[in-house]
A protein has these predicted regions:
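Long, amphipathic alpha-helical surface segments
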Residues: 2-18, 25, 30, 36, ...
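Short, structured surface segments that line ligand/substrate-binding pockets
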Residues: 58-68, 72, 76
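Short, functionally critical alpha-helical segments immediately adjacent to catalytic or ligand/cofactor-binding
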Residues: 1-6, 70-78
Length: 133
């Protein structure tokens, strides 16, 4: 995931109108007027990471899924907010090798417009999920 995101010390307004800092950390506490330290943004990531790991663990089955699948689901959840309880998460939980999973990684729109960066990210995520680099 670190190759898909850039760690920012200065808050940036994202395409949804929220200020983010570090690795896409957004919260009402993010102050757009200040620069954060490496330690602060690393701490934000550790907090956020735990939340998304817990979310992916809701659908993850270590008997039938591998680490690559977990990591790809984590990246997807980190990007969109969650994966458990979604149509994609439910499909993965039912059958992590279902070909229809490819279709869900086509979510590439931001505010109704196709986002070229998101297209590339989703391609990397789904290819990683299915073991294709």
């Amino acid at each position: 995931m670190l190759t898909l995101e850039k760690k920012r010390l200065i808050p940036k307004l994202d395409s949804n109108g929220y200020y983010t800092v570090g690795l896409r950390h957004n919260s009402p506490d993010v102050d757009p007027e200040r620069e954060y330290t490496e330690e602060e943004v690393d701490a934000f990531f550790e907090e956020d990471k735990k939340m998304y790991e817990d979310d992916v663990n809701e659908i993850y089955d270590p008997v039938f899924m591998n680490q690559r699948m977990f990591d790809a689901c984590f990246c997807f959840a980190f990007s969109v907010g969650r994966i458990s309880g979604t149509d994609l998460g439910n499909l993965i939980k039912k059958n992590p090798y279902d070909d229809r999973i490819w279709d869900f990684w086509r979510y590439t729109y931001t505010q109704g417009k196709k986002n070229k960066v998101l297209v590339m990210r989703r391609i990397k995520e789904v290819n990683y999920y299915f073991g294709e680099d």
